Design a protein with these regions (language model features):
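Long amphipathic alpha-helical segments
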Residues: 11-127, 132
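Short coil/turn connectors at secondary-structure junctions
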Residues: 17, 24-26, 61, 163-165, ...
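Fold-independent oxyanion-binding glycine-rich loops
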Residues: 32-34, 47, 69, 170-173, ...
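Glycine-rich oxoanion-binding loops at beta->alpha junctions
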Residues: 34-38, 43, 208-209, 213-228
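Buried hydrophobic packing segments
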Residues: 69-77, 117, 157, 176-184, ...
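Active-site pocket-lining segments that scaffold enzyme catalytic pockets across diverse folds
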Residues: 135-172, 176
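Active-site glycine-rich loop that binds ribose-phosphate moieties when present
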Residues: 148-155, 177, 203, 220-226
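Glycine-rich phosphate/diphosphate-binding loop of Rossmann-like nucleotide-binding domains
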Residues: 170-221
Length: 228
């Protein structure tokens, strides 16, 4: 069954699924958050090993590596599409290990993501469906669940913020930032945001502030020693 619901609707460019990491036709494109928003560039990966390297190289961060991992598993399925069923499963199991361990600090959760993709692959093989597309659909469904859960949190968060008030963020909260602003817009509530820069990668200055701006909110970047 093809996924039609998209929980990223109405969010900033940076939070759209295709602009995090996306598999299509034998490639995974990952938005390079190391240079965004000064440059909008995508790193194109043509093997799952290249996806693992991109994750290791901090091309994407926050929740981005988990989406990249799932899309990397879809790419692995494409790589081994001409093999026998047993060979495909062995190849995907090896890819699971490669991608899961791309970044030591995320290995445990990454393994859960990749294991889920492996189960989606097994089901697709039993049903005779294209494995790469089945894994991508699984990844989109996982994103939908996560985004929707965070959206429910945002619905409780927004009423706590006074109209015309001030919110200070920290680092890049990714989905909760976008969903908070989306729910605020739906409620007709406006407020100002201050984003500490977040050294050394400047996630606050580059990512959080850009999401706030893209969604139409007044945002000011401050240095990390200014919040007090």
């Amino acid at each position: 069954m093809t996924t039609t619901f998209r929980a990223d609707e109405g969010l900033a460019f940076l939070l759209q699924y295709e602009n995090v990491a996306w598999y299509d036709a034998g490639e995974v494109r990952i938005l390079d958050r190391r240079v965004y928003p000064a440059k909008t560039e995508f790193v194109t990966c043509r093997t799952h090993v290249e996806v693992a390297q991109a994750i290791r190289d901090m091309v994407t961060q926050s929740a981005g590596p988990y989406t990249a991992a799932a899309m990397g598993m879809a790419l692995a399925a494409y790589e081994c599409r001409e093999k026998t069923e047993a060979e495909q499963l062995a190849f995907l199991a090896a890819a699971d290990g490669t991608i899961s361990n791309a970044r030591p600090t995320t290995a445990k959760r990454m393994k859960l993501v990749c294991d889920g993709c492996l189960e989606a692959a097994k089901l697709a093989l039993r049903e005779g469906r294209p494995v790469d597309l089945a894994i991508r659909e699984h990844a989109v469904n996982a994103n939908n669940r996560r985004y929707s859960k965070v959206n429910e949190i945002a619905k409780y968060l927004v009423p706590l913020i006074p109209a015309g008030g001030t919110v200070m963020t920290q680092c890049f909260g990714e989905t909760i930032v976008g969903m908070m602003l989306k729910e605020a817009k739906l409620a007709g509530k406006d407020f100002r945001l201050f984003c500490p820069e977040t050294r050394p990668y400047f996630q606050g200055a580059r990512l959080t502030a850009t999401v706030c701006r893209d969604m139409g909110f007044d945002v000011t970047v401050i240095t990390d020693n200014m919040p007090a």
